[in-house]
Amino acid sequence: MKRAGLLLLGMLAAVPAWAADLTVSAASSLTESFRELGAAYEKAHPGTKVDFNFAASGVLLQQISRGAPVDVFASADETTMDQAQQQDLLAAGTREVFAVNALWVVAPPQAKATPRTLKDLAGAGVQRIALGNPDSVPVGRYAKGALEAAGLWPSVQGRIITTQNVRQSLDYVARGEVDAGFVYATDAQAMPDRVRRAFAVPVPGRIAYPLAVTKASTQPVEARRFAAFVRSPQGQAILARHGFGKP
């Protein structure tokens, strides 16, 4: 009996005991960088496991507002985080911008004619344009705003293929299913051999990525520690490798 008890204890000791499980909801454009951040954080904090949920920022906000168990929220824009704050979903004093990005138009490598300006998107050589749903996808809002500012939205609206997130837009371009797509610079960097950078799109202000601990977090101390890690020199170096700029 004693041997059986010792054997059971040994088996339990062999099973990883996570001191804290963190759930991080992050914008789709953060997929590669945050996975690397999570691995580095777990290595630096043994006993902590970081689980990620990647989707469009607006979709993540809806999930959190409906009670999804989330400890940290990282959005691809300030607007979505503003909405989270207005709904009283964020822990006070935890919101902070941790990275910036840029907007690009990309095209399939095999495209006969690569657009070089926004005006080219209204030309005969471009018939299908991937663009994230402006209602829930920040990159879609940035892109629509740029097209409206250039007076081109009415000309290209009929060519828009609406996507659920920026990675879907990137995939459509990579597979040659569209002639062009709006993505972030970091997304284009993630598939350098499958998409061609056409041109950078100027946007007013900056494309800022804010992060905050949720008010409903069950691991508030660990969540704050993870947020601090993202902003630390090590975290910023990881983000920089994936093409993000410092805020």
Question: What name fits each language-model region?
Answer:
Residues 19-45, 49-58, 62-66, 75-78, ...:
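Exported/periplasmic ABC-transporter solute-binding proteins
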Residues 4-16:
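Bacterial N-terminal signal peptides
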